[in-house]
From Swiss-Prot:
InterPro entries, per database record: AB_hydrolase_fold, Dienelactn_hydro
Location of this chain's protein in the cell: Cytoplasm; Nucleus
Cross-referenced SUPFAM superfamilies: alpha/beta-Hydrolases
Family membership noted in the UniProt record: Belongs to the AIM2 family.
Lineage, highest ranks first: Eukaryota, Fungi, Dikarya, Ascomycota, Taphrinomycotina
Annotated GO CC locations: cytosol; nucleus
GO MF terms, alphabetically ordered: hydrolase activity
Protein name per UniProt: Uncharacterized AIM2 family protein C977.15
Keyword Cytoplasm annotated: yes
Keywords assigned by UniProt, alphabetized: Cytoplasm, Nucleus
Organism: Schizosaccharomyces pombe (strain 972 / ATCC 24843) (Fission yeast)
Claim: Cytoplasm is one of the keywords in the record: yes
UniProt-listed Pfam families: DLH (PF01738)
Matching PANTHER family: DIENELACTONE HYDROLASE DOMAIN-CONTAINING PROTEIN-RELATED, DIENELACTONE HYDROLASE FAMILY PROTEIN (AFU_ORTHOLOGUE AFUA_6G01940)
Coiled-coil stretches noted in the UniProt entry, renumbered to this chain: none
Amino acid sequence: MPCCPTKSGAAPTNRNYELQGEMLKDIGGMQTYFTGKRSSKVVLIGFMDVFGLSKQIKEGADQLANHELAIYLPDFLNGETASIEMIDPKTIEQKEARSKFMEKISSPLHWPKLTKVIEDIERIHGQDVKIGAYGFCWGAKVLITYPNKERFLRIGCAHPSLLDPVDAKHVHCPVCFLCSKDEDPEEVDAWKKSFENSPYFSESYFETFGKMHHGWMAARANLSDPENRKYFDLGYQIFLKFFKELF
């Protein structure tokens, strides 16, 4: 998959974990996983990777929601997710399917959906609600290129892909970058350097986890593996500390 630096698919889910949230039928016109405090004035929007609303990102949202936050995970792909054949296509048909899927995940196609999600959150939680957002892989790209990103007070990016230093010049809030060993370090450094002149740089956080693979906080997280579990939990703890500044 051109948006991912590795060719592995989604990992098996944690069967022993019981989700704490619920599916809502219509947030921004999409089915959405919600977890957390309904009356919270601090809301986070989670933007999935190409594997959709995986159980892993729902479990991560539950971890964040245990701390007085309200978390919304909209299904921006409407149930359509990347298959392993799209990740590593072998045949002409598989390559064509990947090309069509890549067209569907073009960031500008999802900006209007994101705007509708924000509007619904403001309707539910009030105009004075504080909104942050976090995304995985491709989802991080959508967030940092969103034209109305000033509505976000903070943006978290886990194993971000498709990094372009030009994007950094248009981000108007602190960011938290949690990168894996698979992201190109030169691309990460170029993005960070482009952001250094931002007044929000001093409040931002960048860390690369050299033992972790691309996707360790999302659908590629193998939570039966002790080391992946350790860094999965640590990643969400870092996100929580970053977003707690909104309180």
